[in-house]
Design a protein with these regions (language model features):
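Short beta-strand segments
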Residues: 1, 30, 54-61, 87-88, ...
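Flexible, glycine-rich active-site loops centered on histidine and acidic residues
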Residues: 46-79
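Short acidic, glycine/serine/threonine-rich loops at helix termini
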Residues: 8-10, 67-71, 226-230
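Claisen-condensing/thiolase-fold acyl-transfer catalytic domains that form or cleave C-C bonds
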Residues: 21-23, 29-51, 155-239
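Phosphate/pyrophosphate-binding loops at sites that engage ATP/ADP/AMP, CoA/4′-phosphopantetheine
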Residues: 138-155, 203-208
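Short, small-residue-biased leader/transition segments that mark boundaries at the very start
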Residues: 2-7
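Acidic-glycine-rich active-site phosphate/pyrophosphate-binding loop
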Residues: 8-20, 56-63, 112-114, 166-176
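Condensing-enzyme catalytic core mediating Claisen C-C bond formation in acyl metabolism
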Residues: 69-134, 138-141, 220, 232-239
Length: 239
């Protein structure tokens, strides 16, 4: 992995592959495991600023390239993946909210590698756990407050699929119904920015998502970053 990979614009390649016109902006957003949520916020802002009705947001990671196989406390947790969602800007009263945050002072900066992109990922798992179980419930409360909804109004809560214990801890802290919290990390591991859209796709294919359901997605990632959103689900029509 060299500078060619670092500066390669994935979004532009997708735009070309889909044969989209030149007046459809395409850009990459990097916010680690929070990337899908950050990308959704950027997409919503672009729709509001430039006009348009639909935005395609893709979360994708190939973390196996950045793992140190000797670091068994980290490398066994992650997987490669990609997922996508189409967002529609509507004139209806369907509730929507999104919140983001960052704490740059909490990052651990390793020594610089001799080649760009060659430093493996390292993580203080216990510190991340403490951060996550505090940030995720706050994100959920924020989007619920903004939409004047309650946990009971939600059909699903889709967390970043980092760790089952983190999700369980959030369920307990929120006094929530664990059945509303989807999990798939036992099959895919932590796929970083891909984890939320991959989970949503699995749920849609399994018939778990129904039109009109209110769904909250919450996540956290390196940086440190975090975010949450509340959307109304609508099946993607083909035609």
């Amino acid at each position: 992995r060299g500078l060619g990979d670092v500066y390669k614009r994935q979004a532009c390649q997708v735009q070309a592959a889909l044969a989209l016109p030149e007046n459809r902006p395409a850009l990459d957003v990097n916010a680690a495991c929070s990337g899908f949520l950050y990308g959704t916020a950027v997409a919503r802002g672009l729709l509001a600023t430039l006009g348009g009705q639909y935005a395609l947001v893709i979360g994708t990671e190939a973390l196996s390239r950045l793992m140190d196989p000797a670091d068994r406390s980290t490398c066994v947790l992650f997987g490669d993946g990609a997922g996508a969602a189409v967002f529609e800007l509507t004139d209806t009263s369907a509730p929507f909210a999104i919140t983001l945050g960052a704490r740059g002072d909490a990052a651990i900066h390793a020594g610089g590698p001799s080649r760009a992109g060659s430093a493996p990922i390292s993580m203080d798992g216990r510190a991340v756990f403490r951060f996550a179980v505090d940030a995720l419930p706050k994100c959920l409360h924020t989007v619920l407050d903004e939409t004047r909804l309650t946990l009971e109004d939600l059909s699903w809560v889709v967390c970043h699929q980092a760790n089952s214990r983190i999700i369980d801890h959030c369920v307990k802290a929120l006094h929530a119904d664990a059945a509303k919290f989807y999990k798939n990390m036992d099959r895919h591991g932590n796929t970083s920015a891909a984890s939320i859209p991959v989970a949503l796709n699995e749920m849609a294919e399994a018939g778990l998502l129904k039109a009109g359901q209110k769904v909250s997605c919450i996540g956290f990632g390196g940086g440190l970053t975090w975010g949450g959103m509340l959307v109304t689900y609508s099946p993607l029509s083909h035609g």
